[in-house]
Amino acid sequence: MELEQMVVKELGISMDDLRELIDRELEKIEFVKQRKAQLLEMEQLVKQKEAEVDHVDKLFDNATRAVDDCETLVKSLYDQIGMTYKESSSEDEGSSKPTEVIEIPDEDDDDVMSVGSGEAVSKIPKEKHLLREAMAAMKRSRQDVQSIVEAIQKKSDGPQTRFSSHPSSPTSSVGGSNQASASNDMSKDGDLVVGMRILGKKRTKTWHKGTLISIQCVGTGKKFKVKFDNKGKSLLSGNHIAYDYHPPPENLTVGSRVVAKYKDGNQVWLYAGIVAEPPSSKNKMRYLIFFDDGYASYVTHAELYPVCRPWSKSWEDIEDVSCRDFIQEYVNAYPNRPMVLLKSGQLIKTEWEGTWWKSKVEEVDGSLVKILFLDDKRCEWIYRGSTRLEPMFSMKTSNASTQEKQQAGQQRTRPNVGAIRSKGPVVQFTHDLTGNEPEHNPAAPPSPQSMPSPQLIDTDSDSQQAQSKKQVAKKSTSFRPGSAGSGQSSPIPTESVPQPPAAPRPFQSNQSVQPVQSIQPIQPIHNIQTIQTIQGIQTIQAIQPIQSIQTLQPIQTIQPLQTIQTLQGNRIVTSIQQFQIIRTENIPAESTYKAPKEKLFYLPHVCNYTCLSRIRPLSHRGKNPLLVPLLYDFRRMTARRRVNRKMGFHVIYKSPCGLSLRTMPEIERYLFETQCKMLFLEMFCLDPYVLVDRKFQPQKPFYYIPDITYGKEDVMLSCVNEIDRTPPPQVAYSKERIPGKGVFINTGADYLVGCDCTDGCRDKSKCACHQLTIQATACTPGAQSNPMAGYQHKRLEECLPTGVYECNKRCKCSANMCNNRLVQHGLQVRLQLFKTQNKGWGIRGLDDIAKGSFVCIYAGKILTDDFADKEGLEMGDEYFANLDHIESVENFKEGYESDAKSSSDSSGVDLKEDHEENSGSEDQEESNDSSDDNFGKNEDITTSSVWRSYATRRTTRGQKENGTSETASKDSRTRDETTDCKLPEETSKNKVASWLSSNTMADSVMDSDSRSSLKMGEALETDKPKESEEASKYPRFAEGNRAYGYNPTPTKKDGVRRPVTKTALHQIKRQSSSAQPTEEVLTLSSSSDSEVGSGTNGSKKPAAQATANDSDDIQTISSGSDEEEEKKNVAASAGPVKRQVAVKSTRGFALKSTHGITVKSNMASGEGGPGRRNTRQFFDGEESCYIIDAKLEGNLGRYLNHSCSPNLFVQNVFVDTHDLRFPWVAFFASKRIRAGTELTWDYNYEVGSVEGKKLLCCCGSTECRGRLL
């Protein structure tokens, strides 16, 4: 008491207050907190165990009563059959006597059961129903006893003793023996033996070597106790241990569960993952591994260890939901896996922490790409199929939008071709790298009678009949941004059209291939089979044996008869008689042009009509249009000249009067001065690589048709078949559009705008028709007209999405001299219909075609959308083309694709530009790079310190554990450094963090929607004092050895995962500041997670560089509270529910295929008013576009096949009407085309847009995307 009084007097506080103060201080100590938490946890465990014991006791009591009931039944049965029942466990009767078996024979002699001790059965029961009742009771009791045994193994020793001391019945003795054997440890389980070396998984998610010390039965399964070499023991399941040896290669299939080494600089860790790609020459014979936490890496066979007891579905062992869903989708779709086709030097947008960043492709290594972020110069390895890459994300979001609209009834089940085809990165559907891809579609039995042709899918064959519930596919005739021939790169949603050919299938032969020893005479080929798909069913047709060349039959020339047209009601019915086959020996030879040897001399004069008086007659129709001027005594000469110290070629023309014409304006002026009406400006070409006298001569064909147009075209269109004897399909040829039922096209002159030009419409500023084309370009984003829009010297260099208006019948200009009349002149180039090897019928040029030249139009019957749906289901949709000009321009103007490549700095633009137009060879100019060429670019495989990833990235909230913040899904592991590397002061925090923080705060006043930016800026400011404290707890890295990654998985509380970097520190700082969700956020999370992370929205450059193009550099994928409002706006602006297929929306929708990604555009220009009407609705309330169907009636445009690297582009041209609904669909050359090259265009189908429909692409391009549908 005296001591207490002295203390109170000295301290000035009472003892009670002192105790409270001490208690409060103790509670603040971290160790005490942990102990209290452990105590609470222990109390919970004790309560849980007590509840389990009570539950087991109840089960035991119930089982005991059941055994007693069974024993009572058995005793009564014994009494009825005159036997004496004795208990086997009775001590007074001597339980040590040998047991005897009571055998109860069943009616079928199937069951023999040992039920305990007793006398031998001397009598057979007479009442069978009593016997069956007793057996059923014994079976039930045995099941109850087994469940008790399993439950007792989990309970304390008390209940076990109680159970063992209880008197057992004849049946319960069996359960007791099972219990005794189950409780003992096992020394062997299959190939796992106690004492063997294995790998085990620790709480840190890393795997370590150890020794198997015991095998225990726990519940219905087995547990394996492992003692690790670096101290510690763990009781693990079979899927958490791995063999300490390298598996044979044949066991490592795609989806196999393995443990692999992950290298980062000098550090090596072991992590679990799945085999994503088998070794091949393209990946340097390495395995691609997808690790459980979202990383991807290539490893060798010596770095793999097989998991001992993997689950049948390997992805179910992955904890993170997004990674699990990604791997499940990947394994199920393999070997068809979409990846972005990339090459070094390309620019591409890449997602990082919810924001799209401009980045550059540094290196391509197989299926991985090394991305350099241009803003902070950091690198990261990413799987080429990850949705962090903008082309993959756009494809996934487009597919999800299509599925959502179809489910909501807003879109018909047709392919959505609104996907953007950029000049650089495109999504490619690759196949098995080993070439051993299994054939998923089994072939049907041979049916030669029903197979008219041996191609895989003959898109031109009328043998393809209608299918029930068939999806309708349509190509689009509107502007394709970023496609070949398009000078624009802004995304525009568009429509789909004729069904493209499917992938080729190799010839199957029963004969084995033998090495060629010597050249032998050609022998007949037998047993060749080709596969053809009709209505989704494969049938095999045997080709007739091909005779040797020496014995080939003479080719057959087919002369078509005239078509017969009859009027039935209001419809013109066209019928065609069968081809008339005429036998001939060879194709008519064409005379070769020989340039005149005499020289032309120029005498000074004024060129006029008399300069061409002697060559006026039209005598060279049907010739190569580029050769026609030479036939009229013009001379075309090629000279070399030095420009910028480089030798180049230059073409000049000499007129018959000796005047030198060096440029297209000079040629144009000369033709006008001489009033030359038999030559057009498009017949002259100054490209030195376009040869005017290069002819293509086909090989000896089986069929030859001089003209399939029946004389309806100005130029004959020949047809050859060099593959087999299949004739071309019977089609009513028409070079003009044919309005169908319910379609009215007003072509009256009173509804057209005409010009009064007398100079051949050379001055665009004075031509009214030219001005229509120029004024229409103001509908593009920015609302600035292009005064140079339209034809340039009768050629169109790039696609104009707003259309081209040609002079018409109301114009006063000369039809032959006008420079604004091109498409209406019809077919001018010489083409040929030919049978391809695996794509059906195709079109190729017989002469060189200059870039920008008009080729042909797409003609057919124009149908309404409703009638096209009906006819497509009945007749097929292979030749449907949407007249979607209105929707294309509207979407282009409103900026529906906010993250599109609208400038040279955006996604898909190469840094290296070729400025040497007239140097080098033509082949070099036309060569294309492919990512396959970059596979395994460096021969020396070096371990990179840059992190690799494959799964969709998302931001998550950081959590603090033991006073330290951790990254959101990965367990950070501190790595031991040999030297203490110090960073410069400005790099102690992430460059991106400082850049975002400073610029976001500096430009927050200028930001139109800066709420989230301000919040993040404030959060960064508040976290700055904590940064040095956090950084001191993590290792430091040298500037030259920085590692970066991302966190696709939710935060885990256990252990350490990946080494922590400055990026991780910055992410911790950002995540800790995002406790309150903002309005503009990124959600890239799994559907089962509700975590939301904060991201920047429209982050801007410094004030000196802040422009409207910032959204092109950095874009935030966001989903906020206004998601539903966005949906309503899209629905209102897109028109009624019944809408065309190709109008693509990227606003506010759930994305199933990418596991919960939500997107909202951040371009203000894309927000339309909810009450705005679609332009098409002003045409008597129409809701959908019209369709061109060339199935039964059409021109040569129906035969143009698809290519992922096309040489034609589509252009809408207005000729006979200015009705926006009915443009002419014209094809122009997007590059120079060599004679004999097949003409192709991009169908622009969206892969996966039609459920149950799959078409492989066999275009053969180096940039082939692999699939069409």
UniProtKB/Swiss-Prot annotation:
GO cellular component terms attached to this protein's record: chromosome; nucleus
SMART domains cross-referenced by the UniProt entry: MBD (SM00391), PreSET (SM00468), SET (SM00317), TUDOR (SM00333)
Acidic residues composition-biased segments: 103-112, 919-932
Ranges annotated as biased composition (Polar residues): 396-414, 486-497, 1106-1120
CDD domains registered for this protein in UniProt: HMT_MBD, SET_SETDB1, Tudor_SETDB1_rpt1, Tudor_SETDB1_rpt2
Residues reported in the UniProt entry to bind Zn(2+) 4: C1204, C1257, C1259, C1264
Span of domain SET: 829-1244
Domain (Tudor): residue spans on this chain: 250-312, 340-395
Pfam family, one: Tudor_5
Location in or out of the cell: Nucleus; Chromosome
List of residues binding S-adenosyl-L-methionine: K839, G840, W841, D877, Y879, R1198, N1201, H1202
Binding site for Zn(2+) 3: C761, C807, C813, C818
MF-aspect GO terms: DNA binding; histone H3K9 methyltransferase activity; histone H3K9 monomethyltransferase activity; histone H3K9me2 methyltransferase activity; promoter-specific chromatin binding; zinc ion binding
Residue ranges, compositional bias (Basic and acidic residues): 968-989, 1021-1033
Annotated Low complexity bias: 164-177, 462-476, 1078-1094
Superkingdom of this protein's organism: Eukaryota
Family statement drawn from the similarity comment of this UniProt entry: Belongs to the class V-like SAM-binding methyltransferase superfamily. Histone-lysine methyltransferase family. Suvar3-9 subfamily.
PANTHER family documented for this protein: HISTONE-LYSINE N-METHYLTRANSFERASE EGGLESS, HISTONE-LYSINE N-METHYLTRANSFERASE SETDB1
Name of the molecule in the record: Histone-lysine N-methyltransferase SETDB1
Source organism of the structure: Xenopus laevis
